[in-house]
Amino acid sequence: MASLSLPITLKNPRFFSSSPQNIFKTQPQTLVLTTKFKTCSIICSSSCTSISSSTTQQKQSNKQTHVSDNKREEKAEEEEEEKEVSLREIWREVQGCNNWEGQLDPMNNHLRREIIRYGEFAQACYDSFDFDPHSKYCGSCKYHPSDFFLNLDLHLHKGYTITRYLYATSNINLPNFFQKSKLSSIWSQHANWMGFVAVATDEEEVSRLGRRDIVIAWRGTVTYLEWIYDLKDILCSANFGDDPSIKIELGFHDLYTKKEDSCKFSSFSAREQVLAEVKRLIEYYGTEEEGHKTSITVTGHSLGASLALVSAYDIAELNLNHVPENNYKIPITVFSFSGPRVGNLRFKERCDELGVKVLRVVNVHDKVPSVPGIFTNEKFQFQKYVEEKTSFPWSYAHVGVELALDHKKSPFLKPTKDLGCAHNLEALLHLVDGYHGKDEEAEKRFCLVTKRDIALVNKSCDFLRGEYHVPPCWRQDENKGMVKNGDGQWVLPDRPLLEPHGPEDIAHHLQQVLGKVNDDNFKPTTT
């Protein structure tokens, strides 16, 4: 085999983006690279951080053997790809109808791509949020719904249309979650942008998915970890159904249900906004032409993952996902990223009874999923007894299936004691891309299947190894949003204010969901 002369090295992060279908297998002192276009054998260290050439006859012979073996593997993989069923055929399994049995170990590639895609919906809530305290628009979304995905360069999401932005009142005791401007004249004194509701409208996308997908994406906290200190670790009755023993953490409940009557953006609570919009979309699409089913997918990261679970439970508890015209139960799936515990064991059991499917994607080194519920949680053998017999006020339980990932398995990430890195969403999506299963051989093989750009990891943190030469926290608006006006002065420009949805619009659908408008019966009972 002729010696290789490569213009790129493994130190270049673009190497992986530009080489489709890379498959890495580590042999002693050898890295084997297989692509759809060519197969080659590269000598490198086991850490995949240095490359050297081979001149000995023995190593040349080894190369030939590796090439032959991997050509056979490549052919088998290509044949397997041809046999692979389409997403539209297995979307129910990907959405968790069987609790992802047989899909996580090894990782099903359709599921991998969908986890990443929904994670990007959650990441978009960070990337579009104005957290600049020097801006009068601090706490709002920087983009209009019509060009939201275009501005974020999310071409894979262009088949969706955002139908409603979600807002919450900032007049609750979560100071590290809400962002406020330092200026006196601002877009809203009481509201923060919380996320959006979107629906798949492009017929090609609907056909690819196999159904009409309604997405609810919740924003997490810009401060990453500081918001944890705001949690009171107090359980309160959810009051979304008839069972007062179903309880969720008080801070999450307040964020979801509180409102500010004097504010046009939060005169309806985040709960009322999302329920009204889901009701409207189900009425519009739920009975459409035969052949199209509907799904509801809720996603969020960190505190946003908490809201994702609460809202998914709420929709199911109210039976909002039932379409009586064709007796169809719309499946509800939560893709949760780095989420904390939300409610007690009875809350977890009720989610299971209602058929809410939850896939929790976590980094094992992240501390957020371990709170609240340090004293009593789902790992405690007698939790059910403690809750039923003693009304223990600090008992929490995770809901759903866990996909636990380890950032130490990635050769691209450096060792760090920064807890924010372990909690970072882009880093988590990077781990999803490289994960292949729990067995020993799969854990050794970290291969980026979708070729997700590793530079994204450093978008808002410093986690990549130095040899990739990607600056930390690199994402920001050009000139931090400053522009030169007609007088030659640099200023933060005005932008068109988004008008809130009219109260009549929300009230009409809310009336059908809750039975009355501006319901005052959601005052929590704390324990």
Curated annotation (Swiss-Prot):
CDD domains found in the cross-reference section: Lipase_3
Active site, renumbered: S302, D366, H423
Motif stretch (GXSXG): 300-304
E.C. designation(s): 3.1.1.-
Compositionally biased region (Low complexity): 55-65
Alphabetical list of InterPro entries matching this protein: AB_hydrolase_fold, Fungal_lipase-type
Basic and acidic residues composition bias: residue spans: 66-75
Gene Ontology CC terms: chloroplast
Family per record: Belongs to the AB hydrolase superfamily. Lipase family.
Protein's recorded name: Phospholipase A1-Igamma3, chloroplastic
GO molecular function: galactolipase activity; phospholipase A1 activity; triacylglycerol lipase activity
Catalytic activity from the UniProt record: 1,2-dihexadecanoyl-sn-glycero-3-phosphocholine + H2O = 2-hexadecanoyl-sn-glycero-3-phosphocholine + hexadecanoate + H(+); a 1,2-diacyl-3-O-(beta-D-galactosyl)-sn-glycerol + H2O = an acyl-3-O-(beta-D-galactosyl)-sn-glycerol + a fatty acid + H(+); a 1,2-diacyl-3-O-[alpha-D-galactosyl-(1->6)-beta-D-galactosyl]-sn-glycerol + H2O = acyl-3-O-[alpha-D-galactosyl-(1->6)-beta-D-galactosyl]-sn-glycerol + a fatty acid + H(+)
Keywords: Chloroplast, Hydrolase, Lipid degradation, Lipid metabolism, Plastid, Transit peptide
Leading EC class: hydrolase
Transmembrane segments: none
Tissue and organ distribution: Highly expressed in flowers. Lower levels in seedlings, leaves and stems.
Gene that this polypeptide is encoded by: DALL2
Transit peptide: 1-52
Subcellular location: Plastid, Chloroplast
